[in-house]
Amino acid sequence: MSEIEQLKKQVEAQGGVVRQLKADKADKAAIDEQVKVLLSLKDKLRIASGEPASGSKSAKSFSLKTPKGTKDYTAKEMSVRSKIFSTITSVFEKHGAVTIDTPVFELKEILTGKYGEDSKLIYDLKDQGGEECSLRYDLTVPFARHVAMNGISNVKRFQIAKVYRRDQPAMTKGRMREFYQCDYDIAGQYDAMIPDAECVRVAVEVLTSLDVGSFVIKINHRKILDAIFEVSGVPEDKIRTISSAVDKLDKLPWADVKKEMTEEKGLDESVADKIGEYVRLSGREELLDKLRALPELMASSKAQEGVADMDLFFKYAKIYNILDYVSFDMSLARGLDYYTGIIYEAVLTEENVRPTEAQPTATGAKEVKEGGEIDESQVRVGSIAAGGRYDELVGMFSAARRGGKAKGKNSNVPCVGISFGVERIYSIVMSRLPAETIKANKTQVALKIATELWDAGIPAEFTYKVKPRLQSQYNTCDQEVIPWAVLIGSDEVASGNVKIKNMAVKVEGEEGGVTVKRSDMISELKQRLGL
């Protein structure tokens, strides 16, 4: 065996040692020591391969790529993303929300202790100037800090910005380390469950407007969950960690979740079995009757409050015409520590998962490639929006500002919100576009036509569907009062023509549209629009 082959094997073995230490959450000093050994071996391998060592000044080449979990977007990709952002923004503004902006990094103490087990995913920055800072993990905690710091008593706000997480990236399915979130939140004292139901209504409007396909919004209540844990016998100090385990039921089978509860978190097996009886329940408003029929559970004041809230929610959901999109799912836990009331999560339904995507492995875990990276082909898109009520987060910051005493009318501002994962939505939209081919198809031509119209200063929209129904597009024109349509079909693609159709007025002889050359499309439209 050559020296290079030996070094490669040593690097591979040492990499396994480092990964195992990290998985075991070993002491940082022990991990750092083994990382030094790994880096030393890698330097030896570079030198043996005829490359300069990593610290050598003679190094003339470097890896020209973006960091893991990030990516560049082309102009064409950005046109699709901009459409997604504008669609989401228009729904937010329609509901009366105003936009704000917050720093991309916060004081570390602002973010610490708000995310449960996910706190390990926060990016910490090196100390510069005496302040310990971290990149924001989400937009919710900075918003709560903003409300507390500025003494705001009520606001309906939205924010579209990047957040950062040290996650295992799976970029083809929308899991990244740098990504956009679109948040909509309502802060203030209002009648119970009205803002909560509106947030779910906003989610339905956004997802239907973006045409992501079939989806369901799972809902649950943290007070009901906490009551389940209490009556099942979960110790107070384990409730949040057990809640985080339950939150994995959308990815793992019950047997694996139970194993985590008992073997990793030290929960008694009989307690875990009791939890399992509850968290596998799901349905709609009829599930409330089942819960009311459980005397042990309903003896808890938390359960009574949670059931009363959910009863109100279903009443308002019916009025908002969103009942068909909602599923009451007792396994939904949302691992973040700041939730206090209703919680919800929008997911694609099973029939909407592309058949080309691999399903999770038998254990529910994702395959790991050699080198410790997640095999992206084993990852599905997952949730595309999530949120809930967080009534105590603003008060936590207000109390800290007053030295631990929360006083004043704005000290504890109730809040509820929803956050949309743009990268995952973008993955869905892009997955519906066929793979690029040498021969232009109708979808690609539609994208090019839309781009040409925008470049010419003509407002335009197009459907994201690969095979859209013509009548549904006509209906959209009627509903949104769009006066003109550019039509393309297989014949038009082949001949290099388009059809221009007046959608506002029926013109005799032009019922099916007027055929013009692609090269004349802009001038013809400008003439007809009087531009």
Listing of model-derived features with the role each one plays in the protein:
Residues 8-80, 126, 235, 251, ...:
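Auxiliary tRNA-acceptor-end handling modules of aminoacyl-tRNA synthetases
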Residues 47-144, 149, 177-180, 192, ...:
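TRNA-binding/sensing appendages of the translation machinery
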Residues 217-228:
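Glycine-rich, mobile lid/loop segments that gate access to catalytic sites or pores
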Residues 4, 59-60, 479-484:
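Accessory terminal regions of nucleic-acid processing enzymes
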Residues 208, 227, 233-237:
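Retroelement reverse transcriptase polymerase core
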Residues 80-95, 106-109, 139-151, 155, ...:
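Positively charged, Gly/Ser-enriched RNA/tRNA-binding surfaces
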Residues 120-128, 233-262, 348-352:
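Acidic, His- and aromatic-enriched active-site or binding-groove loops in soluble protein domains
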Residues 1-8:
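Short, charge/polar-rich alpha-helical segments
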